[in-house]
Regions:
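Structured beta-strand/loop patches that form or line metal/cofactor-binding pockets in enzymes
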Residues: 1-13
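Active-site- and interface-proximal helix/loop "cap" or "latch" segments in soluble metabolic
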Residues: 4, 22-86, 90
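Acidic surface patches and DE-rich sequence motifs
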Residues: 16
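C-terminal charged interaction modules
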Residues: 79-112
Length: 112
């Protein structure tokens, strides 16, 4: 008998008449998250050959918020790479680049 189970992560996007997102909500039952509000999401999946992605943000998200979101997302990708591969050097390179980018675009330590 198998102990396999299925987990569900759900994203709900409300759009205006022009199909621009006005509200993003998400749930992840296993994490205890139900109908939580989000301003943006970046979903990437790997089909064995290429990464496919869906990136959405609500119409009220500011340019500065998007810059922070992108830099934070890049840092979490570095963390995921390190956990999956134990390649500290590659993850460190991503973190270094991201830190430099954050400073250059005004959302890093030099901007504070």
């Amino acid at each position: 008998m198998s102990d396999a189970r299925t987990s569900r992560i759900e994203l709900n996007v409300t759009t205006d008449e022009n199909k621009v997102p006005t509200s993003i909500r998400w749930s992840a039952g296993d994490a205890g998250i139900a109908n939580a509000e989000a301003k943006a999401f970046a979903l990437s999946v790997w089909n064995g050959r290429e990464a496919l992605s869906i990136d959405l943000w609500d119409k009220d998200m500011t340019v500065d918020e998007m810059k922070v979101f992108v830099c934070q997302s890049m840092m979490t990708l570095a963390d995921a790479l390190e956990r999956a591969t134990q390649d500290e050097r590659a993850a460190g390179a991503i973190r270094g680049f991201t830190s430099e980018l954050a400073e250059r675009i005004g959302v890093g330590p030099a901007a504070e």
